[in-house]
Regions:
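Flexible, glycine/small-residue-enriched loop-and-beta-strand segment within the central core
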Residues: 57-172, 201, 209
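C-terminal/domain-terminus segments
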Residues: 72, 175-199, 203
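Short linear functional motifs in flexible/disordered or boundary regions
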Residues: 33-35, 49, 67, 89, ...
Length: 209
């Protein structure tokens, strides 16, 4: 521990961790939720959700696995407070899946939709206000209301060992490779290879890294 952390602060940290483990016990009826996860205040976990051990779920976060495969969260992940990880946005058409691999950190106030398949690779760190939308409205027909034209569902894939800044948006069909860095506020609308720095709206490759 850092020398700046006093013994009293450390004791409070340990107490808070114990409380979060106790909170997690109410989710143990779900056989796919580990006994050793840390759950914040007013967290909601429902439907098809699998969470591996040592994962932290922040206060007021909602995880809903209503979908074909549901939500899978790996070991040692950290999901920030006030996040929404939701497979289906309505009950008329079930979503697919959200697969968050081991050692992923997602900042506070993030939204991950699962209308089609979303994968976040292991060891990826993500800032606050991430937004992932794995579907897109079709709007080409001028005679039909946009809401009635259906959606595309190509999915979103984020590689391993990436660093994604705050307020980044991924749209349907977009992906980034392994070891990519994405600048804050970028909008990812297409596919990017491994080992690149990506910035802008719409995002472009700035350089190889």
């Amino acid at each position: 521990f850092d020398d700046a952390i006093s013994s009293s602060m450390l004791c409070q940290l340990i107490i808070n961790k114990i409380i979060s483990i106790v909170r997690a016990q109410k989710f143990l009826l779900k056989k796919t939720v580990s006994k050793l996860i840390f759950v914040g205040r007013n967290v909601s976990i429902s439907n098809k959700v699998s969470i591996s051990k040592y994962t932290v779920i922040g206060d007021y976060t909602k995880i809903d696995g209503l979908g074909v495969k549901g939500v899978i969260i790996g070991r040692n992940c950290n999901i920030g407070a006030f996040c929404r990880i939701i497979c289906s946005v309505n009950y008329r058409q079930a979503g697919d899946s959200i697969d968050i691999k081991d050692n992923v950190a997602i900042g506070e106030f993030s939204y991950v939709g699962g209308a089609s398949k979303v994968v976040i690779g292991k060891d990826t760190i993500i800032g606050q206000y991430l937004s992932i939308h794995p579907e897109n409205h079709i709007f080409q027909n001028k005679t039909i209301p946009i809401r009635m034209q259906g959606t595309t569902k190509k999915g979103v894939n984020i590689g391993e060992n990436c660093w994604i800044g705050s307020k980044v948006t991924f749209t349907d069909g977009s992906s980034i490779g392994n070891r990519c860095v994405v600048g804050a506020g970028s909008v990812i609308t297409k596919k990017f290879p491994d080992n690149v720095l990506i910035v802008g709206s719409p995002a472009k490759i700035v350089k190889n890294i």
